[in-house]
């Protein structure tokens, strides 16, 4: 029996009507070889922890030999890109290979990114380059390490295939896993194409596969949308709390289950700059860090419009009204945890706001500040105050914070121990990713492997790797990244 036949693999998406996808065979790269295999993730699916002597895995994920249990397909969807509707979207470089169940019985998509041309490639070549593949692998695993809902990366390959972008780069492959690759844009495609029966079918399948709790509801489609609103609010609250800027929040990059999706020109905050723009194509700052909560609502409104044949307008409006309430509640809960506060007090929102104002006015590194604050039990308050130019204002805030901490039952030691579990020491700063990419292009993958290890446990000290927690050099701050992949 084939290795693949021994696993719990299905292809349920391929049973949908053909307006949802096109069957496409992957086009292999030249001399594909493993760069990283995520052994910890592999274990959850009974996949081998070591791939170096496992030719069937290499053959399948490089596209050389497609197992009979796979049904490779390119999904069709649409979406609003920078606010404008584009009907001509779909998987232009990636293929959904199959779905595989983990040890708990949960289904995950196996998706191959960089697999070659599809009918939706438009002017692209269907390839992914090493640079963008490294960025997506590292960031998806970094987000998982931070506890933020995200797609995952099972592995990546490099090759001998040259791919032209601004210049020639190395072709690469990413094996992405997600509970679903269904996006807001899938619903938009069906709605704007007037495929209303198919829109209902997709909604039924999304409920069956991802929101079975909605099956018994009087209004199951509304219940589904309420769940999407809730998960989106939670995801974006997590982004704002950790200082993550996605960079390209088009509706075709929004997961219907609230997972961070499609890592392109992302960035983590260095200095706390609310208006930080990480995408150099975002000339108007539509997707700036401080605009992400607003764009989340805009995107949900676009999805609501696409669901209007199934859900009453008044119900959709009420559901959308809950978004900002949920986002605020989730964000407040997360910030209390980051500050070691267990109880909810009336002045907490002002405490958070004054902290952000102070960080912004003094251009203080956000990750470093939160981590230093987590060590306040073993340092005097001056260590925190010295992070600021305006030490007088910083002293006032720290005193206010310490007064607030006295309302908690936890000791300082216990509070700080909890804070160190939610305030990371290591995040994927863009300059670190760039340094790893430069080395990788020279054949040295050591930084990629070190970062993948550190970012899997970002709250731990890792004393031998302190340099990866250092503040960025001036050239490494405010890096704007291209969408080119």
Curated annotation (Swiss-Prot):
Entry cofactors: Mg(2+); Mn(2+)
EC number in record: 2.7.7.-, 2.7.7.108
Highest taxon of the lineage: Bacteria
Cysteine-cysteine disulfides: none
Reactions this protein catalyses: L-seryl-[protein] + ATP = 3-O-(5'-adenylyl)-L-seryl-[protein] + diphosphate; L-threonyl-[protein] + ATP = 3-O-(5'-adenylyl)-L-threonyl-[protein] + diphosphate; L-tyrosyl-[protein] + ATP = O-(5'-adenylyl)-L-tyrosyl-[protein] + diphosphate; L-histidyl-[protein] + UTP = N(tele)-(5'-uridylyl)-L-histidyl-[protein] + diphosphate
Sequence positions that bind ATP: 90, 92-93, 113, 125-126, 176, 183, 262
Active-site residue numbers: 252 (proton acceptor)
Keywords in alphabetical order: ATP-binding, Magnesium, Manganese, Metal-binding, Nucleotide-binding, Nucleotidyltransferase, Transferase
Keyword Nucleotide-binding set for record: yes
Top-rank EC class of the record's enzyme: transferase
InterPro entries: SelO
Keyword hit for Lipoprotein: no
Sequence positions that bind Mg(2+): 253, 262
Purpose: Nucleotidyltransferase involved in the post-translational modification of proteins. It can catalyze the addition of adenosine monophosphate (AMP) or uridine monophosphate (UMP) to a protein, resulting in modifications known as AMPylation and UMPylation.
Protein name: Protein nucleotidyltransferase YdiU
